[in-house]
Swiss-Prot record:
Residues annotated as binding Mg(2+): 40, 62
GO annotations of cellular component type: cytosol
Keywords: Cell cycle, Cell division, GTP-binding, Magnesium, Metal-binding, Nucleotide-binding, Septation
InterPro entries, per database record: G_ENGB_dom, GTP-bd, GTP-bd_ribosome_bio_YsxC, P-loop_NTPase
Gene this protein is translated from: engB
A Pfam family: MMR_HSR1
Source organism phylogeny: Bacteria, Pseudomonadati, Pseudomonadota, Gammaproteobacteria, Enterobacterales
Keyword Metal-binding assigned: yes
Regions that span the bilayer: none
Keyword Cell inner membrane (UniProt): no
Ranges of residues in domain EngB-type G: 25-199
Annotated CDD domains: YihA_EngB
Entry binding sites for GTP: 33-40, 60-64, 78-81, 145-148, 178-180
Full protein name: Probable GTP-binding protein EngB
Amino acid sequence: MTNLNYQQTHFVMSAPDIRHLPSDRGIEVAFAGRSNAGKSSALNTLTNQKSLARTSKTPGRTQLINLFEVVDGKRLVDLPGYGYAEVPEEMKRKWQRALGEYLEKRQSLQGLVVLMDIRHPLKDLDQQMIQWAVESNIQVLVLLTKADKLASGARKAQLNMVREAVLAFNGDVQVEAFSSLKKQGVDKLRQKLDSWFSELAPVEEIQDGE
């Protein structure tokens, strides 16, 4: 398994929906979460870049699918934040359609990172994202963000509770605590991404050799 240098990650493009994404080749790992789950902060922490993903003071601002390339053919995908109360209902439905379409149809999608505030995990739409991924045979890493907001005992209790709850999905769902501020869980995230990004390599090599 190759240890990728995530600091080399760079922005490629924004797309309003799956039809405007580049060709469905290589490997993609998508990041999804409610609008205030700390998704942009997690991407910036992962890549050790202050402004790779824009952190907005106005949750629900990111309405586009944003693509970042780690190395050639290996991409991180920042999906639109979901579930923000002040976003019009029609826009919410549009986002949810776009998210569902991406998870169901994108062949290069290898893994899904679902981010949730550790204090308010497993809201309806979080569960919907995990369910979609499991039904599409996509592995999931749940990051319980803002873990620094809880004392150690409460943090462990939440982590154990969510780990227990996700068993009901009957899929490959891993759960870790994460803090952008304290850099907690970053190594676990990198390890998971490395494993996802290396999974298709043998198949590609076989095809090249034919």
